[in-house]
């Protein structure tokens, strides 16, 4: 922020709420309107030869400042408001002037202003990450406190400058450092900043969850409850904050919530307390380990029950309809007791596997006598075995999760910050790692995935660099299995049902096959549903891979970008599209009798542009 008007705001600053942001160099992405208006209202200095050194510093007029200092001005001398030149240079992000003043003897930790702050404090308030880096490199002490008792990390938390928080912690400043009242950054975040951040961001650095402050002896969870900060309460409970610690008044977080009559927080605390109590029972722990198996068994039984009701020996469809409604009502209750919320995302996967189970049983029991000895039978067996294999490989193979140790994360943060690249385009604020090219953070898996394609509902896993090729074969053999069952259904009806399609038409034919075997029609409908989506996805994937060289995420992102562009954006003209044969060779990592050779790229660790020898193209992130 520039200008003298903004500096006066900083001198008399009170710690109110600030909009969060993670812009370039740590500058808040959504700038305060008053500060923006103040910047626009600043007068232009046409003649800088007569301005004083304070104004020259504020406006970054280096030559005028150098002239006055060399004429004898003491760079340590504060102005009438007790603000040094280094303060003015720091708040206005004048890097060259800071270097010059320090070289002329300026005290890097000189206190000044109404809040008795250091230049580092002023730079942090405005979110100037390059200035923070420069001051620390010249010996600024981040542990010093201002007149309100806040150190550097506390100010960064209050003003929600996540890049500065990450940089300070990576430079060995304690995430549990206390202010004058004994409050840690996590306490301040939970109490002063309403919302999920920076509480969630701080939790990634493993702060102490159960430490208490000096005066009230509140934990971070106490402070979040006191402020009614629902998002912070959720984050702290997920991290494992204690529910039993009492403050100086003998109150637990639940007691405080009851006093404040915040019904949502009361519900959250009681639910968490109940879950932690259940964890003590061996049966409950066993059920949690078997949640996915129980979900699969529930799906298998439910699908059998639906088919059994449809095949029930009764002409009353009203009775069958009532039984189906009752069945769905009962099955909707079971997951609430047997399966946790996080594992409900695997419901489509359980539905798919249950469908395949009953498809196989139907083929073996009903269709096998009509197709025994035929090549179609062996083709079906091969297809279903291959489907199960590639489903397992898609599910079990690492899709390309990016991993880094705590020390590597801190080194990456420091490196990115000091090169001016600590922003959301190159740094993942969830994983605290440098993002490889073509990667994306999956919020379901809570990890960055290399060459991210999608999070597949049907496999319950991300599709990325490591398992994308398995996913293609999974779709192919699923289409094959469903195609064979559709074929087998018509063979079964032609052999076992008296149909008059040619004489009476389609409607009569449908009534005849429903009356003949509702179960087979039910299985046919399941097979048709899975055949439809799997074939569509397979064709879409092959088109993207062979003709575009893009992932699903990249294609969707480019289509969204094209809506806001004046010129038409061609999906074929991207650096990743190297031609039909080369795209396939690179994707499946196989050549074609020496005519096409694949280019081996490890997308889990590819951070820079890649030179492709096949077409002499440079690959860039879409």
Swiss-Prot record:
Its EC number is 2.3.1.225. Keywords: Acetylation, Acyltransferase, ANK repeat, Cytoplasmic vesicle, Golgi apparatus, Lipoprotein, Membrane, Palmitate, Repeat, Transferase, Transmembrane, Transmembrane helix. It comes from the Eukaryota. The active site is at residue 456. It is a multi-pass membrane protein. Its main location: Golgi. Coiled coil: none annotated. ANK repeats lie at residues 43-78, 81-110, 115-144, 148-177, 181-211, 216-245, 249-279. GO terms for cellular component: Golgi apparatus; Golgi membrane; Golgi-associated vesicle membrane. The DHHC domain is required for palmitoyltransferase activity. Palmitoyltransferase that could catalyze the addition of palmitate onto various protein substrates. Palmitoyltransferase for HTT and GAD2. May play a role in Mg(2+) transport. Belongs to the DHHC palmitoyltransferase family. AKR/ZDHHC17 subfamily. This is Palmitoyltransferase ZDHHC13. It comes from Macaca fascicularis (Crab-eating macaque).
